[in-house]
């Protein structure tokens, strides 16, 4: 089939996503959320374990926030590596059609002085 395509998103694209109802998902681990904070409006769903395996609860949690395969989804991680791989899998293997990822991750977001919220473990 065709190579999976996911859209490379900029900080500005994410700001738009916050306003237009796009589902924003932070796929990092809880210790990373605590370290950097999180972007306002993001769903927190860990995609990979520390050793890089797919997190056992990811698919169930992910599917619980998605209404259908056309749902606009924007993923972010630390620097864009994990979301690039995950996004391609969502398109290729699960048939999602509207997936983008924050190319520079939260690292690039914070470099540009964009706001984050603190993460509380109770979330």
Stretches found by the model and what they are:
Residues 24-26:
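Structural scaffold elements adjacent to functional motifs in cytosolic proteins
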């Amino acid at each position: 089939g065709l190579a999976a395509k996911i859209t490379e998103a900029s900080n500005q694209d994410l700001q738009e996503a916050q306003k237009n109802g796009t589902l924003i998902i932070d796929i990092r681990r809880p210790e990373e959320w605590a370290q950097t904070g999180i972007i306002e409006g993001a769903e927190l769903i860990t995609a990979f374990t520390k050793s890089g395996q797919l997190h056992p609860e990811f698919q169930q949690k992910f599917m619980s926030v998605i209404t259908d395969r056309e749902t606009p989804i924007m993923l972010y991680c630390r620097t864009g590596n994990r979301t690039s791989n995950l996004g391609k899998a969502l398109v290729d293997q699960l048939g999602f059609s509207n997936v983008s990822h924050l190319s520079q991750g939260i690292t690039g977001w914070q470099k540009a002085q964009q706001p984050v919220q603190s993460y509380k473990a109770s979330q």
